[in-house]
């Protein structure tokens, strides 16, 4: 699925796609259709898609949702690595622990308005 997407965009090759898949803890040789994956594996594939082109800005919505404790730790480490690479991470989450661990700035938004902002809420 990801290789096909990359080929459509024409921006990266097989090696970059496989690297992104490995970085999220999946096996590049696994050829299942997206719908056959568990929720946690789908979440990992979505994150692989977000990072495979090494973008300057990465938008993630509930990146640890559906993952077990080991998976949560792996994805948090991956997000930290992307931050160290210089990527700006925009993270939407209801998970307070994710915000404490990953966020430099936190915004509480309700009804489309910023209610509070800071390093913690």
Where does each model-flagged region fall?
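Conserved ABC ATPase "signature" region
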Residues: 3, 12-29
